[in-house]
């Protein structure tokens, strides 16, 4: 019985100690998280206006003493350090082209120091020259850099002579004359007249025979006349 009571007292003591440590740890964690939550600061504002940046840079440049570099001596290191200073920030009264002119000046000075031949090619667009966006012409760009689109001539049926393609060296009047000549050679008017009215098969057969005999008579007559002139030229 004494051993049993001793074991029970030891178990009670161990359980009480474990529960007390757990409560203290929970309270400490809660107190730590609460204090940490109260200690959090609001995040800084990442946005800084351009005007404030310009004012800060201007104040930093004004606080610098340019005489310190000159007192160090005329060494090349001092000149390079002075040339490496950032440019003066633009003010509200400066024109937008002042920055471009400054860039042109810097590029010209760098190219002229490296080689005299490339000094003229380093300039960008200045205020005296128009901007490339001001002189942009889409039609002129397409005519100079894009191939002209070829018109598709799809021949799904025999040509009727109603279309005539005019080249660049031909005028409108000459094109109309060539069109009328092509229409007459293809007998377009005759075909249109025959298509407008219905023609009986017997009349069509007679017309074809008549036209065939007329064409043969015309060709035979021309051949006889040509033969006569050939014999006359030969001295007969």
Swiss-Prot record:
One of its GO terms (cellular component) is ribonucleoprotein complex. InterPro entries: Mitoribosomal_bS21, Ribosomal_bS21. Keywords: Mitochondrion, Ribonucleoprotein, Ribosomal protein. Residues 65-136 are annotated as: Disordered. The keyword Ribonucleoprotein applies. It is found in: Mitochondrion. One of its GO terms (molecular function) is structural constituent of ribosome. Residues 107-131 have a biased composition (Low complexity). GO terms for biological process: translation. Its main location: mitochondrion. The keyword Ribonucleoprotein applies. Component of the mitochondrial ribosome (mitoribosome), a dedicated translation machinery responsible for the synthesis of mitochondrial genome-encoded proteins, including at least some of the essential transmembrane subunits of the mitochondrial respiratory chain. The mitoribosomes are attached to the mitochondrial inner membrane and translation products are cotranslationally integrated into the membrane. Component of the mitochondrial small ribosomal subunit (mt-SSU). Mature N.crassa 74S mitochondrial ribosomes consist of a small (37S) and a large (54S) subunit. The 37S small subunit contains a 16S ribosomal RNA (16S mt-rRNA) and 32 different proteins. The 54S large subunit contains a 23S rRNA (23S mt-rRNA) and 42 different proteins. PANTHER family: 37S RIBOSOMAL PROTEIN MRP21, MITOCHONDRIAL (PTHR41237), SMALL RIBOSOMAL SUBUNIT PROTEIN BS21M (PTHR41237:SF1). Belongs to the bacterial ribosomal protein bS21 family. This is Small ribosomal subunit protein bS21m. It comes from Neurospora crassa (strain ATCC 24698 / 74-OR23-1A / CBS 708.71 / DSM 1257 / FGSC 987). The gene is mrp21.
């Amino acid at each position: 019985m004494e051993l049993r009571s001793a074991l029970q007292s030891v178990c009670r003591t161990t359980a009480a100690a474990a529960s007390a440590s757990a409560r203290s740890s929970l309270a400490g964690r809660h107190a730590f998280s609460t204090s940490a939550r109260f200690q959090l600061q609001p995040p800084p504002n990442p946005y800084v206006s351009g005007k404030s940046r310009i004012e800060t840079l201007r104040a930093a440049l004004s606080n610098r003493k340019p005489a310190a570099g000159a007192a160090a001596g005329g060494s090349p290191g001092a000149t390079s350090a002075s040339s490496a200073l950032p440019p003066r920030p633009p003010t509200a009264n400066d024109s937008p082209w002042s920055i471009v002119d400054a860039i042109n000046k810097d590029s010209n000075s760098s190219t002229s120091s490296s080689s005299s031949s490339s000094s003229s090619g380093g300039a960008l667009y200045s205020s005296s020259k128009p901007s490339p966006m001001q002189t942009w012409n889409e039609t002129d760009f397409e005519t100079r850099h894009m191939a002209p689109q070829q018109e598709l001539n799809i021949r799904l049926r025999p040509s009727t002579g109603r279309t005539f393609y005019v080249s660049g060296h031909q005028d409108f009047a000459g094109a109309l004359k060539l069109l009328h000549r092509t229409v007459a050679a293809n007998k377009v008017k005759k075909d249109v007249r025959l298509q407008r009215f219905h023609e009986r098969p017997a009349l069509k057969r007679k017309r074809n025979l008549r036209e065939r005999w007329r064409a043969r008579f015309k060709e035979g007559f021309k051949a006889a006349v040509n033969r006569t002139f050939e014999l006359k030229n030969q001295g007969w």
